[in-house]
Amino acid sequence: KVCLAAPKPKVTASILKALEIIKKEPAIRARLWENTDYLRSRLTTEGFDIGKSVSPIFPIMIRDNKKVYEIAKMLQKKGIFTIGIVYPAVRTKEARLRVSVLATHEHEQLDALINALNDINKDIKIKKE
């Protein structure tokens, strides 16, 4: 059984406004992709498994449901918000953190994520072997 509903007018208006901003201010998109490339490079260089992500939304593969919850909580205590994705949303051995990059992020903020993950890796193994 499938249920479909049209988006609410305020959602449609928000989407249209976002598209208008993107069209009028291409520097925002450029900054988003610069930040995306920066974080992808840093995560890969540091040895974290991010799969084949090509978007500003990165999976950081943890592959253990319990570890995902622990790491997300540790990051939150450091002021870094991530989303844990675990079974049944993904296969049992594909548990991950989801990190979203924004155009408004500064490199220092992205570096703070890397530093926090490196600190956590000392206690909970999360880097690729």
What residues fall within each predicted segment?
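PLP-dependent aminotransferase class I/II
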Residues: K1-L43, F48-G51
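Beta-strand->loop->alpha-helix junctions that form or flank phosphate-binding loops
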Residues: A6, I83-P88
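Alpha-helix N-capping/helix-start residues
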Residues: P9, P26, N65, H107-E108
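A general structural signal for well-ordered alpha-helical segments in protein cores
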Residues: T12-I15, V68, L110
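Conserved PLP-binding catalytic core of the aspartate aminotransferase-like
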Residues: A30-L39, T44-G79, A89, K93-E94, ...
